[in-house]
Amino acid sequence: MWRLRIGAEARQDPHLFTTNNFAGRQIWEFDANGGSPEELAEVEEARLNFANNKSRFKASPDLFWRRQFLREKKFEQKIPRVRIEDAEKITYEDAKTALRRGVLYYAACQANDGHWPSEVSGSMFLDAPFVICLYITGHLEKIFTLEHVKELLRYMYNTQNEDGGWGLDVESHSVMFCTVLNYICLRILGVEPDHDGQKSACARARKWILDHGGATYAPMVAKAWLSVLGVYDWSGCKPLPPEIWMLPSFSPINGGTLWIYIRDLLMGMSYLYGKKFVATPTALILQLREELYPQPYSKIIWSKARNRCAKEDLLYPKSFGQDLFWEGVHMLSENIINRWPLNKFVRQRALRTTMELVHYHDETTHYITGACVAKPFHMLACWVEDPDGDYFKKHLARVPDFIWIAEDGLKFQLMGMQSWNAALSLQVMLAANMDDEIRSTLIKGYDFLKQSQISENPQGDHLKMFRDITKGGWTFQDREQGLPISDGTAESIECCIHFHRMPSEFIGEKMDVEKLYDAVNFLIYLQSDNGGMPVWEPAPGKKWLEWLSPVEHVENTVVEQEYLECTGSVIAGLVCFKKEFPDHRPKEIEKLIKKGLKYIEDLQMPDGSWYGNWGVCFTYGTLFAVRGLAAAGKTFGNSEAIRRAVQFILNTQNAEGGWGESALSCPNKKYIPSKGNVTNVVNTGQAMMVLLIGGQMERDPSPVHRAAKVLINSQLDIGDFPQQERRGIYMNMLLHYPTYRNMFSLWALALYTNALRLLVS
């Protein structure tokens, strides 16, 4: 039976190192003798329920770890479930009861180190690169047991589309990118090309690939993986010359200009490209060469495939001028720099420089790297440099950090969300006004935040190594990943301020005030001239560089951007900080808030909404915008922006009283209701919060009562809420954040309960 181990509970590896006793680390381990017959039957029932209902909801409820924690804590839901017939007759006691049920359940889901575990999945191009890398390096069977393989195959089968392909995420149409990578993944894991049982997964996938032109129509990142495996030729790839890391700082584009994740990704890719590394051919590799193309492998003209991309993948088409630019880069890279004598001087020096950067970034992120997309490239680059070296072994030790097990199988996560989950979950707990009932939850959560703050900048000359300041920030994941984010830092500040106000006798040792100052300093440093807040690093403002992007399936990948949600969170966090510590950099904070407010107001859409970059989509964005505006003193009475936002939310409420937004809103950049305008509890919680923050209860509470009825009646017997469509997103890729169903539903109910209490009093 699979069990989730937290922090130092997990089996240790001599190549792991930690700065905070592995706080937040989440590792799945299989216990062959674990689980009672009842528990094992419960696991199989959960798998069957998911498989039977995946045509309706493709996101798993992520129940395995929750049930494990509830058993370990002997949690029983003793509060009777509330059912509402008439929304207009909801009482304070009804709302408080539903809130307490949900909060006590969710508190029981807290890990012993203070965070709330969760998978962060959905992208269907994350699994195969790890499998390919481990296959090439000969470590597949050392990392993957038979149980791992069984669960990974389960996930592949569960997420395959009816037409045989796989989409960018589990809810989207099939694309060459994910279909060709997952086909290779299945073959490496031992699935036969034609006779693989009733599912015929490989046969169906291969038909899709060949019907759409073959693997030469895969996008850039997929071509790189095909090339290192030896089932594609590097000459058919867009150039990724390692010399980019030698460009001077005054160059319009250099390593420091790049967006942090494309920088991380290109480091490993460019080293492998510069080396033209190809795995030693095996019988399987030779078979794949024949299976992936409609024509003989030896007859493919690779140079003509360089700019090819299947129309299903080409969400952001490239112009003739862009293709011409990349042809020029290819000519410079391969016909000049990579020819004697320059290859002996420039290329070799560039490769050494690239690996110095790879090692630096790996060390400063504890070999977690920026995220799942970059890690296998870094890991393979380290193996190519030295198969027996410690760098590669340190990478292997961190592979389990990316694995997640749920009812739908095993998948590799994009990254963890430990700190983000903790900050938002604690805000929910604090809003519930149940401090005495959940004191231990608050203490553990506060301790986790204190352990998770980054206390120093990256070692050495970090700017030379293309790393910016980090001191004072919180990451999305855990402290050891080392890449702080603005919104997560702001949300953590707000939590810590609330805890700072509590008596030490209740909450324990307080965070050093200087550490809060460090966090605020980090946020002030990040703000752009336009008032917006980027996520990770100061935005360079060179948005014209996006024209150079070689990536076909997503936009805005070259340089850091400003984001609405980050700006709203930062304003809310700094307003809270300013009230408690008015003497720390007051002018800079006031300036940041003023510029941030204008940035938010300028982004408002004609219908009163805001576009959300990190969630689905206009409902999510509108919540973070209104929350930031309201924190700074804007109200329905004095702010046209809030009035328009409230009207947008009222206009999109469905007949049931809830909200449900289609993920199509994100790529189309206009509000689209869910199919049939069906309610989603996450969207409903977010929209209800907008109305409550916007003072709707004082004008006409009926829409809020109707929304509350939806949430209260949606609550399950245990106190959980139903898992519906995925509500996380980045660009056009849906991400699975299962804890959102608890956080936003309970946060809305907490605000609603407080509003009812004020009406009663």
Swiss-Prot record:
This is Marneral synthase. The keyword DNA damage does not apply. The active site is at D487. It catalyses: (S)-2,3-epoxysqualene = marneral. Converts oxidosqualene to marneral. It comes from Arabidopsis thaliana (Mouse-ear cress). Its EC number is 5.4.99.53. The gene is MRN1. Belongs to the terpene cyclase/mutase family. NCBIfam families: squalene_cyclas (TIGR01787). GO terms for cellular component: endoplasmic reticulum; lipid droplet. Keywords: Isomerase, Repeat.
